[in-house]
């Protein structure tokens, strides 16, 4: 729950930074910037999924408990797909962030697709759902993959997108990862072994 909140809230803050751009040839052309971004969550199996995480997604409106059916007409469902546009977010500290009048701190609408796979079919299958399933329909210019728990830094998604936008021959890119050491690096001072710290 905390890991999902950390990632999802960081993504929503990054989308806010993109929407707040004043001078952009791409993002401000042909409609609001938020309409050009889709956040797709792919969860690998109902059984291993944490109920608290589903409650978090229900809080922001992406998930609805009780509407899924394991089979329809005696055919087992492969996935359950929910879509929603939300301005709500939950911080890693479990605080609900809702829209407000402050334009710079308020979160913009974010289009979300939540794909909850019936069975745990591993990560490669999840990637296939993203690229083969949703990618063929949405036809995105750029896909950025994040694991739950990864907190994107300020403007980090924008930096990755700019790399692709400015170089049409670019086939892949990766961001830089830093360990979260806690407030004031409390954990960092206790990690004396550099291999453990890495």
UniProtKB/Swiss-Prot annotation:
Reaction(s) the record says it catalyses: [(1->4)-N-acetyl-beta-D-glucosaminyl](n) + UDP-N-acetyl-alpha-D-glucosamine = [(1->4)-N-acetyl-beta-D-glucosaminyl](n+1) + UDP + H(+)
EC number(s) on file: 2.4.1.16
Subcellular location: Cell membrane
Any one of the GO CC terms: plasma membrane
Keywords of this entry: Cell membrane, Cell wall biogenesis/degradation, Glycosyltransferase, Membrane, Transferase, Transmembrane
Xref: InterPro entries: Chitin_synth, Chitin_synth_fun
GO biological process: cell wall organization; chitin biosynthetic process
Membrane protein topology class: Multi-pass membrane protein
Signal sequence extent: none
One GO MF term attached to the UniProt entry: chitin synthase activity
Functional summary from the UniProt entry: Polymerizes chitin, a structural polymer of the cell wall and septum, by transferring the sugar moiety of UDP-GlcNAc to the non-reducing end of the growing chitin polymer.
Entries under PANTHER family matching the protein: CHITIN SYNTHASE, CHITIN SYNTHASE B
Membership in a protein family: Belongs to the chitin synthase family. Class III subfamily.
Protein name from the UniProt record: Chitin synthase 2
Source organism of this protein record: Rhinocladiella atrovirens
Taxonomic placement: Eukaryota, Fungi, Dikarya, Ascomycota, Pezizomycotina
């Amino acid at each position: 729950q905390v890991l999902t909140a950390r990632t999802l809230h960081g993504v929503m803050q990054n989308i806010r930074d993109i929407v707040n751009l004043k001078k952009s040839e791409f993002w401000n052309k042909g409609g609001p910037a938020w309409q050009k971004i889709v956040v797709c969550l792919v969860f690998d199996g109902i059984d291993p999924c944490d109920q608290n995480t589903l409650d978090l997604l229900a809080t922001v409106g992406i998930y609805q408990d009780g509407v899924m059916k394991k089979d329809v007409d005696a055919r087992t469902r492969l996935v359950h797909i929910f879509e929603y546009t939300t301005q709500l977010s939950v911080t890693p500290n479990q605080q609900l962030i809702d829209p407000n009048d402050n334009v710079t701190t308020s979160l913009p609408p974010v289009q979300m697709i939540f794909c909850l796979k019936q069975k745990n079919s591993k990560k490669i299958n999840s990637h296939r759902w993203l690229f083969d399933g949703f990618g063929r329909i949405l036809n995105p210019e750029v896909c950025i993959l994040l694991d739950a728990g990864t907190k994107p830094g300020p403007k980090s998604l924008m930096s990755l997108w700019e790399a692709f936008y400015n170089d049409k021959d670019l086939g892949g890119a990766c961001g830089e990862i830093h360990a979260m050491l806690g407030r004031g690096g409390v954990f960092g001072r206790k990690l004396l072994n550099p291999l453990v710290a890495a």
